[in-house]
């Protein structure tokens, strides 16, 4: 059985957010690079750096937390994996759901690459729903 790299990314980010850590390290692949760029553009990360250590590439993500006097507050409320290796979920462009009335973001793998639900609706293409983030 292969590794589900998308589930590993989601789990790493969720665990760091729940533990209120500011920095997360994830393995670097083409899929993770595209997903990280999207989430950075959507404002879920403050900074992304690519590092190489022992001939292995990885990303160092700085999570965006709101400041409080006692401790940082969580910013990411929920990450949910939808399509998985055992059950793929596909939607046409007209049927792509809206999360929290458009406040959440859906990451979709399309024939034109990985993009958000808004971009897929604008281009009129559907695809595989990878995960929700809100």
From Swiss-Prot:
Key words, A-Z: Plastid, Ribonucleoprotein, Ribosomal protein, RNA-binding, rRNA-binding
Principal cellular location given in the protein's record: plastid
Gene Ontology molecular function: rRNA binding; structural constituent of ribosome
Pfam families: Ribosomal_S8 (PF00410)
GO biological process: translation
InterPro entries for the chain: Ribosomal_uS8 (IPR000630), Ribosomal_uS8_CS (IPR047863), Ribosomal_uS8_sf (IPR035987)
PROSITE patterns recorded: RIBOSOMAL_S8
Subcellular localization, as worded in the UniProt entry: Plastid
GO CC annotations, alphabetized: plastid; ribonucleoprotein complex; ribosome
Keyword Ribosomal protein among record annotations: yes
Subunit note: Part of the 30S ribosomal subunit.
Family that this chain belongs to: Belongs to the universal ribosomal protein uS8 family.
Protein purpose: One of the primary rRNA binding proteins, it binds directly to 16S rRNA central domain where it helps coordinate assembly of the platform of the 30S subunit.
Name of protein: Small ribosomal subunit protein uS8c
Organism: Cuscuta reflexa
